[in-house]
């Protein structure tokens, strides 16, 4: 378990639901349900058709406040579990509810000691794994896979960098780091924001001039503009 709290920059408000949804690759409606829950639905005669949906992912953000970097990471991890491993949403809900019962840090999915197999969620504890979906059962680390190669972790034990997919393909050239470019997408090797490069191009500068001025390749500038256009869509 992390011995310290996450770095403050990781929990600051940073992303609207729409922005976070584009980074993660889900609809804004889906992300809103995960973090805010959903209202009950009723029939015309007033009978309940569906009860109110409780949030799955905890967040300190208020109803209209931006999400933090760690919120973004948790949404990415949840989406990855659902998409890649067909992980039942009910299992995630059980895990979050179990953590809440003993007041543990609720940013479980953004922590380095998070593990998963195809049917359970675990946290590292005392060199073993505590099953959150089996409510306290311990497991052997060797039977599990830790993953999510799009994330790197910091010395605080929490996610530090996020490399979002581009056109559903892994990439390591563009990164989201909460301490760089205000947490927005930037060129990994330089820390230059894709939005800044796109703004210069939109203002009429040639790509080749931008690349030379910033010490970048022409491809870096082209890809930055593509990232900007994709996230602005």
Regions inferred by a protein language model and the residue ranges of each:
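Long, charge-rich, low-complexity intrinsically disordered regions
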Residues: 1-33, 39, 43, 48-52, ...
């Amino acid at each position: 378990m992390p011995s310290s709290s996450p770095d403050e920059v990781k929990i600051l408000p940073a992303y609207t639901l729409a922005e976070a949804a584009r980074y993660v690759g889900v609809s804004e409606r889906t992300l809103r349900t995960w973090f805010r829950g959903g209202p009950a639905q009723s029939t015309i005669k007033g009978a309940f058709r569906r009860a109110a949906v409780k949030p799955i992912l905890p967040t300190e953000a208020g109803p209209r406040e931006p999400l933090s970097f760690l919120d973004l990471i948790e949404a990415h991890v949840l989406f990855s579990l659902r998409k890649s491993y067909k992980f039942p949403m009910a299992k995630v809900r059980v895990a979050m509810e179990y953590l809440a019962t003993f007041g543990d840090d609720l940013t479980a999915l953004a922590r380095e000691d998070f593990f998963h197999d195809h049917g359970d969620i675990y946290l590292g504890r005392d060199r073993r794994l505590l099953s959150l979906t089996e409510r306290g059962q311990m497991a052997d680390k060797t039977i599990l896979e830790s993953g999510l190669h799009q994330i790197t972790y910091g010395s605080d034990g929490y996610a530090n960098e996020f490399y979002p997919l581009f056109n559903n393909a892994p990439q390591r050239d563009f990164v989201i780091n909460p301490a760089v470019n205000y947490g927005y997408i930037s060129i990994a090797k330089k820390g230059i924001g894709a939005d800044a490069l796109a703004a210069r191009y939109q203002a009429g500068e040639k790509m080749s001039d931008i690349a030379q001025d910033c010490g970048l390749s022409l491809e870096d500038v082209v890809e930055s503009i593509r990232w900007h256009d994709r996230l602005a869509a």
